[in-house]
């Protein structure tokens, strides 16, 4: 058995190392106590130095955001499961404001408002963070909106164009296609993403507030099936989440988008929808005992939306020239755009696309009311070619709507009014589009130009969409040079116009309508003119008996 030996030198050396590395430290920690907790709100006492919007840590890893800073207590919005909290629980300050991780790895993922992955594909690694409450870019940091943000929807790109850095409101009753318009806009960025050019690529963020979980899953599948998920991030705060999550979700989307914008990249953020965010904020404010105002909303609900939407901008070239385009969605009741939240957001944004339930029920989809919809800054971003071909489209449609209302009561119309009415019917039919089928700007220009030239006037109304689809397919196959000439929205040249006119006439010769009749009929026989007849005298001899 080996003998145990103790070396005094080793013991002395170990003690010396331990004492030399020891440095006395005194730390101070401010803690509070929960005095009440219910409905996602906690009242905490004993934290006199807490900051507004500071993160507080509760037992079990639950966090909250300090909102009401009263003299003797703090009103805290709980983020997460508040049912485990009870009176007497200890609360610690973190000294940090609410922030989320950001970066390229968030593309293709579904996250909650805290930036945590909820799609079952593992955690998202990120070395950067960005605060949720950030100052919007100042006036000197911006430049005018001049680049188009193509939606792929003819009615929007032609009449209410959207530019990169713009805030365009999508407003309408429930079930009028508001989300579909925004999803189609995301799908239309696929070709830009495929180029690999950072100046053309658009990163998309879809913020779902207060929707059913099944609806969010369906949207994710639609994006995945069409190859759009790889450049899209979904921020989900479904109806089952607490009011705190619904309130913060749009700010999470904005923070993620601003990170890319300040890197000189282009971003599209869709807030679906801000009505539910306002309702969640109203619930939080009432539970915090803040004084209610109109429709029981707190006095700062306008500031809630303005500070969010002001983050959309087109930065100047010194800051990289990045942009953040915002498409907020607002749900109305009975098409009432004069309610509190709709009027607030209309006054904040740069224009609105108004979707009407009556048009939707008539089969006009997207159900855009041209008379109420407007884009205040997008006109400068519209391509020159589209601006030329669609110049009179809005007026033609508005005149058609007026004439249609008049024709319902008038017994007889003059030929000019009848022709205008017939062309209006075909324009309405031409502007209809199926979901998840956005059109390129070149296809839109060709369709609208030909409609303006009257090439659809002799096509039956029920065949207009099929005629357009088959015509574009034929033109791509046989006259691809026209599309190359107008690529990117360049105006039509005289040669392209002449080529199109001939190509359409050739196509009409073989097009069969639904009832089997050709669009161009054989001309009716006409009597010969005097100059076309050769006159000669015929001598008739008669036999005499």
Swiss-Prot record:
Matches recorded under Pfam families = ATP-synt_ab, ATP-synt_ab_C, ATP-synt_ab_N
InterPro entries hit by this protein: ATP_synth_asu-like_sf, ATP_synth_asu_C, ATP_synth_asu_C_sf, ATP_synth_F1_a_nt-bd_dom, ATP_synth_F1_asu, ATPase_a/bsu_AS, ATPase_F1/V1/A1_a/bsu_N, ATPase_F1/V1/A1_a/bsu_N_sf
Where is this chain's protein located in or outside the cell?
Cell membrane
User: Its principal location?
Assistant: membrane
SUPFAM superfamilies xrefs: C-terminal domain of alpha and beta subunits of F1 ATP synthase, N-terminal domain of alpha and beta subunits of F1 ATP synthase, P-loop containing nucleoside triphosphate hydrolases
Where does the record place the region Disordered? 511-545
Q: Where on this chain does ATP bind?
A: 172-179
Q: List where Polar residues composition bias occurs.
A: 535-545
Keywords tagged on the record? ATP synthesis, ATP-binding, Cell membrane, CF(1), Hydrogen ion transport, Ion transport, Membrane, Nucleotide-binding, Translocase, Transport
Which reaction is the catalytic activity of this chain? ATP + H2O + 4 H(+)(in) = ADP + phosphate + 5 H(+)(out)
Q: Give the molecular function GO annotations.
A: ADP binding; ATP binding; proton-transporting ATP synthase activity, rotational mechanism
Quaternary structure (record): F-type ATPases have 2 components, CF(1) - the catalytic core - and CF(0) - the membrane proton channel. CF(1) has five subunits: alpha(3), beta(3), gamma(1), delta(1), epsilon(1). CF(0) has three main subunits: a(1), b(2) and c(9-12). The alpha and beta chains form an alternating ring which encloses part of the gamma chain. CF(1) is attached to CF(0) by a central stalk formed by the gamma and epsilon chains, while a peripheral stalk is formed by the delta and b chains.
Sum up the protein's function in the record's words.
Answer: Produces ATP from ADP in the presence of a proton gradient across the membrane. The alpha chain is a regulatory subunit.
What NCBIfam families has UniProt attached to this entry? atpA, PRK13343.1
Q: What is this protein called?
A: ATP synthase subunit alpha
Q: Which organism is it from?
A: Corynebacterium jeikeium (strain K411)
| Species lineage | Bacteria, Bacillati, Actinomycetota, Actinomycetes, Mycobacteriales
> Which gene is the coding source of this polypeptide chain?
atpA
